[in-house]
Amino acid sequence: IRTLRNYGSKEKYVNEVKGVNSRLDPLQAAILRVKLKVLDEWTDRRCRIAYIYNELMGSAVELSIPYVPVWAKPVWHLYVVRTANRLTLQSQLTKASIGTLIHYPIPPHKQDAFKDGNEMMLPIADRLSAEVLSLPFGPHLSVENANMIANTCKLCDLLA
């Protein structure tokens, strides 16, 4: 049952069976209820950090930042960049003590949960899963740290 409640996964990003996201227990619900009081503040903070990233990395050549249409006002859960040089960028950021994550390293059509579709050819999904890199992001991040992270990414882009 735990596996089914966690997207059909025992190991992060490895879906063995089809599952759902049903991990909210009463304690987590109580904590989230308290956090709702600062939701607007956190949303504004996330937007500010995304703006900094967009401004500082927007002219990068080897790094693609999230596209945001003029009319859109995203809330921002993650800040995910794309680069064909993901491992190099991740390594350089790690050397600068900047943690990153890869969301999601295995595309859905290659998960065991969808083994009936594993033979599908989805080259765009395959390419994206090899290029995406999530940068540190959230309301906890200071403006100074956001600037440092973006400038480090930009420097790595120039060296690529």
Description of each model-found segment:
Residues 1-160:
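PLP-dependent aminotransferase class I/II
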